Amino acid sequence: MSRYTGPSWKQSRRLGLSLTGTGKELARRNYVPGQHGPNNRSKLSEYGLQLAEKQKLRFSYGLGEKQFRNLVVQATKIKEGTLGFNFMVLLERRLDNVVYRLGLATTRRQARQFVNHGHILVDGKRVDIPSYRVDPGQVISVREKSMKVPAILEAVEATLGRPAFVSFDAEKLKGSLTRLPERDEINPEINEALVVEFYNKML
């Protein structure tokens, strides 16, 4: 299954979750898109619940199915902690996500574009791989030639708050993942146990 590239507002309404983080998609129409949307919230089976939760998390981070499943497999190899939480931490450590958490982009999709276009440095070296895994303490910054890119400056100005597990210098446009996040600091609306149950049959 390829990465979804259609309108985020439509997918947000289908999943019942704001993919942009603004909540605007659900403010006026908090039901699935389509002619019968307002009356189409039918009760889901156990599998349906697992699938819906998996899709919410996958679309939130903007990953293709193969990438998403591979991260689950990688999480199974971590000996400490629960599989679900370890999986969530691996998602958070992706470079595109850290760029988003720092406020250098307004959405993860935009953050991925900034990384792909070579605007982002890790410890002073350009990294254009969105899935690059960031370690605590590594410095994420904007390339000097990109420091006046309007979209980046607008994102920084629009960011009202940042998670406690990152630090950021708005003047220098650089920051870092200071530590790994705690479970209650990331995606409280997601039940990762359902996601793990969905993949248990495949692992």
Curated annotation (Swiss-Prot):
Kindly list the biological process annotations in GO that this record carries.
ribosomal small subunit biogenesis; translation
Q: Does the keyword DNA damage apply?
A: no
Pfam families the record matches: Ribosomal_S4, S4
Recorded superkingdom? Bacteria
Instruction: Give all residue intervals belonging to the S4 RNA-binding domain.
Output: 93-156
Q: Which residues form the signal peptide?
A: none
Cellular component GO terms, alphabetical:
small ribosomal subunit
Q: Which UniProt keywords apply?
A: Ribonucleoprotein, Ribosomal protein, RNA-binding, rRNA-binding
Supply the InterPro entries for this chain. Answer: Ribosomal_uS4 (IPR022801), Ribosomal_uS4_bac-type (IPR005709), Ribosomal_uS4_CS (IPR018079), Ribosomal_uS4_N (IPR001912), S4_RNA-bd (IPR002942), S4_RNA-bd_sf (IPR036986)
What terms describe the molecular function in GO for this protein?
rRNA binding; structural constituent of ribosome
Oligomer status and interactors: Part of the 30S ribosomal subunit. Contacts protein S5. The interaction surface between S4 and S5 is involved in control of translational fidelity.
UniProt family annotation? Belongs to the universal ribosomal protein uS4 family.
- PANTHER family linked to this entry: 30S 40S RIBOSOMAL PROTEIN (PTHR11831), SMALL RIBOSOMAL SUBUNIT PROTEIN US4M (PTHR11831:SF4)
Q: Which HAMAP family match?
A: Ribosomal_uS4_B
Q: What is the role of this chain?
A: One of the primary rRNA binding proteins, it binds directly to 16S rRNA where it nucleates assembly of the body of the 30S subunit.
Please state what the protein is called.
Small ribosomal subunit protein uS4
